[in-house]
Amino acid sequence: MVRMEEPAVKQGFLHLQQQQTFGKKWRRFAAVLYGESGCALARLELQDVPEKTRRGEATRKVVRLSDCLRVAEVGSEASSPRDTSAFILETKERLYLLAAPSAERSDWIQAICLLAFPGQRKGSPGLEEKSGSPCMEENELYSSSTTGLCKEYMVTIRPTEASERCRLRGSYTLRTGVSALELWGGPEPGTQLYDWPYRFLRRFGRDKATFSFEAGRRCLSGEGNFEFETRHGNEIFQALEKVIAVQKNATPSGPPSLPATGPMMPTVLPRPESPYSRPHDSLPSPSPGTLVPGMRPGAPEGEYAVPFDTVAHSLRKSFRGLLTGPPPHLPDPLYDSIQEDPGAPLPDHIYDEPEGVAALSLYDRTQRPSGETWREQATADGGPSSLQQDSSVPDWPQATEYDNVILKKGPK
């Protein structure tokens, strides 16, 4: 049977740490990384070097990348072989500790992540040319600037009051996550025991052999001091400073606010003003071009539609500058028609009112003298007796309606 050759995404040499009878030992493998195709899954194959293959001691391991949970760098505490750097590959079944040449470790991690997590693809020239999809680059402004800051360190717990309360003893993996400091370990691989959000850490420090921090009361572990024995206290300290600095400089996520295009309008609509909602003295005086509230154009005028005092007050204010003397005393409309004889003539006005303001009266029409009155007025050549007689005041009839008017009028 002829086996069809699949295109390899990446190949080279990797070291795998294996558990043996007398401890752990690094073993060198030829590694080949395959991508997903129509008849195969994405996987990492580890085969023995050609020397052992010729002796019949070949060993082949296959890691299915669809079961991969995480890929991360490991500090130098893993004591990897010379000129190599370690990284972990965790799946649902077990945790692999691998080592690649120091110059190639980041390339291996990036290639594995591209195949294991296809939703988080980064621009890879070799992979994009084979797949035929357009080359994509990651936007550094899109909340992924802390991806490269996540690192893991092997630490050993020092007994403190807080660690005893949390029942932490032995060796663990301390990871500087995106938003919290995480502690991984336990009987099952890939178990996160505790996390301490950066905003809840009161203080942290390090020396040559120790890294420590003080957790606040809002942390899941409660407040207290935690100390870890490690040779990489300075690296953990610097990584923690970087992540905190990135979070401080990050812009807050939220919907963009729309720029204001004009003055804000009140949300409550104004209520229609009623002529009885305020006292009469506080109402504004109507202008000549303004309709009185409650009146509609073309509507029949009612007898009590407009108060008389309001109209009179408005007219006095409008024509105050036109009148030469004080305004005439207007009679009270409630009492100006008492004991009025419809047939008797009304008294003449002392002052002329502006045109169009005064009401129509009977004396607006011209009248001719009646009877022989014109003869008496034309007699001008009479004697002194006649002049004296004409200038005298005739007797006033006793039953006249205007006696009260003559009596009320004072001397000028």
UniProtKB/Swiss-Prot annotation:
Keywords: Phosphoprotein
InterPro entries in alphabetical order: Docking_Protein_DOK, Dok1/2/3_PTB, IRS_PTB, PH-like_dom_sf, PH_domain
GO MF assignments: transmembrane receptor protein tyrosine kinase adaptor activity
One GO BP annotation of this record: Ras protein signal transduction
PTM description: On immunoreceptor stimulation, phosphorylated on C-terminal tyrosine residues. Phosphorylation on Tyr-351 is required for binding to the SH2 domain of NCK. Phosphorylation on both Tyr-276 and Tyr-304 is required for interaction with RASGAP. Phosphorylated on tyrosine residues by TEK/TIE2.
Classification via Gene3D superfamilies: Pleckstrin-homology domain (PH domain)/Phosphotyrosine-binding domain (PTB)
PROSITE patterns in alphabetical order: IRS_PTB, PH_DOMAIN
One GO cellular component, as annotated: plasma membrane
Effect of residue 276 to F: No loss of binding to SH2 domain of RASGAP or NCK. Complete loss of binding to SH2 domain of RASGAP
Statement: the UniProt record of this protein carries the keyword Phosphoprotein: yes
Stretches the record annotates as Disordered: 250-304, 322-349, 366-412
Tissue: Highly expressed in spleen and lung.
Residues annotated as domain IRS-type PTB: 149-254
One Pfam short name: PH
Residues covered by the PH domain: 7-117
Modified residues (Phosphotyrosine): 276, 304, 351
Comment block on domains: PTB domain mediates receptor interaction.
Stated family: Belongs to the DOK family. Type A subfamily.
Its biological purpose: DOK proteins are enzymatically inert adaptor or scaffolding proteins. They provide a docking platform for the assembly of multimolecular signaling complexes. DOK2 may modulate the cellular proliferation induced by IL-4, as well as IL-2 and IL-3. May be involved in modulating Bcr-Abl signaling. Attenuates EGF-stimulated MAP kinase activation.
Assembly, per entry: Interacts with phosphorylated RASGAP and EGFR. Interacts with RET and NCK. Interacts (via PH domain) with TEK/TIE2 (tyrosine phosphorylated).
Name of the protein described by the UniProt record: Docking protein 2
Organism name: Mus musculus
The organism's taxonomic lineage, starting at the top: Eukaryota, Metazoa, Chordata, Craniata, Vertebrata
